[in-house]
From Swiss-Prot:
Entries under Pfam families matching the protein: YbeY
Cofactor binding note of this UniProt entry: Binds 1 zinc ion.
Database matches in InterPro entries: MetalPrtase_cat_dom_sf_prd, YbeY, YbeY_CS
Protein source organism: Burkholderia thailandensis (strain ATCC 700388 / DSM 13276 / CCUG 48851 / CIP 106301 / E264)
Name of the protein described by the UniProt record: Endoribonuclease YbeY
Region annotation (Endoribonuclease YbeY) ranges: 173-437
A GO term, aspect molecular function: RNA endonuclease activity
Amino acid sequence: MRATGRARGARRPLRVVRRPGCPVTRPNRPVHQSIGPTSRLARVDVHPSACAVSIEIAPLAARGRRNTDPAGTPLADSAPLRQPLRSVRAHRFGIRAMTRGRAITRTSNEPSSHAGHASPKPPANHRPGRRPTSTPNRRAPAPPPSATPRETPSGRSSVWCILNRVQTDVNVMKSSRSSKSARAEAAQPEFPRLSLFDAKGKVKTVEAQALRVDFADGRSLMFDLSGSSGDAAVAIVAQHTDPSLRATIALRPEHYDSVTVEAGADENPDFAHDATDDAGEDAPNREPELDLAVQYGDEIGDAQRRSLPKRKVIAEWLEPAIFSDAQFTVRFVGADEGRTLNHSYRHKDYATNVLTFAYGEEPDGVTVADLVLCCPVVEKEAREQGKTLVAHYAHLLVHGALHAQGYDHERGEEDAAEMEALEIDILAKLGFPNPYR
């Protein structure tokens, strides 16, 4: 925002200084304003942690000194810091004096007559309370305090001195301002004053203990202004509304007196661990999942295939019979393939109704098995026992699934009774009658 005027006594914005090896920052940023009554430059000290950072503002250099690094070491190749000059108009003498500390410069075209601190004679066109027309309306550059009077090429004398009467006027102005400063300090609030700027540059000042900046994606930055981190220090904490994400803080230095704070987010390992624990606690109540594949042997023609149970129906029959995640392959074969498999693995030279090839459990707890049903044998048994073909297929599939999970009716009568009772209960849930009656 460009200012068109400035009231007497108002602080002039600090100009940005280009320093070798450092990027040039944008002018008139609030972090570049001088601090304190002596207009010293500020240095930013950063104390980071996991998701928080403490930024402390400290004085860097006094007015008129050479540029220094953050450690306070003077830089040999840098130019003196250009500080804003205090403008004092001495109406009594009709001159405009530019002060840097206590040093002022005379800008009148008249030769200096400061010997004995005598006041110069005002120009002929001077009127009290106005600036003489012969005085250029620009500021003269301020030399170092140790400068001595010298003759300029134009023949004019540019004298650097301290005028008692002008200094008296300055002291009067300072005394009036000091009384206002004393009253302001007496009414100083307990917490820092927060200035908010809108898009048009208008400022609104409030007294606040904390400030939070919320972003659209759930990230936020909390600024602690209570002073608990120390004088002229602000603690900044990054937060995120999503518990699965952990807020982070990234610092990007721009200049010796400014730093950019960026809020980020990454995966929260604690949240992932808690979610895994919750999943483990809920695992017993979770329905087991079935990965089912259906195959047909070479002896099964298209007409017979259409009469066999479909994959969806087979899955509905097997789901109540599995107690953990399972990966089953159901294969319908003819008499020749059924006989070959039974002879190869059980050393029995005939085809049987169902063969179960259990491969045990995988490391992740999934039961893997193949269930082979011989269609001619199943159809023959259904006719002989007076059962429907669908009910008999359902019973044999449940029987083979229990075998795959470790149940065995051939180990003894007790194991056989347990397995039969389980089969009856599962088939009853599916709507089928007791197969052993």
